[in-house]
From Swiss-Prot:
Function: Catalyzes the phosphorylation of the 3'-hydroxyl group of dephosphocoenzyme A to form coenzyme A.
Keyword rRNA processing included in the entry's annotation: no
Protein source organism: Escherichia coli (strain K12)
EC annotation from Swiss-Prot or TrEMBL: 2.7.1.24
Subunit and partners: Monomer. Forms homotrimers in the presence of sulfate. The trimeric form exists in solution in equilibrium with the monomeric form.
Protein name: Dephospho-CoA kinase
Length: 206
């Protein structure tokens, strides 16, 4: 068994920056979003199933998934969203477990944007939340993705609240300041997680 630290935060909170800082310290990072993209790569069985269910227009000329079209299709249709989740979630879970087993670092950092929404925090040994104010989320996301304030507000409304994320947190990184301020927080937490992982391994041994 591997000690799992789940990392989460709302859109624009800086999850990638924090994850990269842990990766720089030699920690294996398992990213749920990357795995979600991998299971629908061209040629993947799940992609064929999506085309069969939603129609061939969901697949671009180069064989990739038309993500925006799919998002628009399921956004206002809970039944279709449930169908898609039932298809993809087991595949994502299977690949996640595979990557955890392949990990070589003392603990793994599991990056899960929808950790709270999908109650996945129960699968982790510890939860780290990257916390920023909603206003910071708005500004960063508008700048990064070149989208309107209204668009970001819709995304925020669909995600778990800041309070809900903080309620499941064991550790919190305040990322309202400059990005380079994160390094010291990550170094401190890394030392703590190494200790916890070591204790976890010694308890696991028969």
């Amino acid at each position: 068994m591997r000690y799992i630290v789940a990392l989460t935060g709302g859109i624009g909170s800086g999850k990638s920056t924090v994850a990269n800082a842990f990766a720089d310290l030699g920690i294996n990072v398992i990213d749920a979003d990357i795995i979600a993209r991998q299971v629908v790569e061209p040629g993947a069985p799940a992609l064929h199933a999506i085309a069969d269910h939603f129609g061939a227009n969901m697949i671009a000329a180069d064989g990739t998934l038309q993500r925006r079209a799919l998002r628009e299709r399921i956004f206002a249709n809970p039944e279709e969203k449930n169908w898609l989740n039932a298809l993809l979630h087991p595949l994502i879970q299977q690949e996640t477990q595979h990557q955890i087993q392949q990990a070589t670092s003392p603990y793994v950092l599991w990056v899960v944007p929808l950790l709270v929404e999908n109650s996945l925090y129960k699968k982790a040994n510890r939860v780290l939340v990257v916390d920023v104010s909603p206003e910071t989320q708005l500004k960063r996301t508008m700048q990064r993705d070149d989208v309107t304030r209204e668009h970001v507000e819709q995304i925020l409304a669909a995600q778990a609240t800041r309070e809900a994320r903080l309620a499941v947190a064991d550790d919190v990184i305040d990322n309202n300041g400059a990005p380079d301020a994160i390094a010291s927080d990550v170094a401190r937490l890394h030392a703590h997680y190494l200790q916890l992982a070591s204790q976890f391994v010694s308890q696991e041994k028969p």
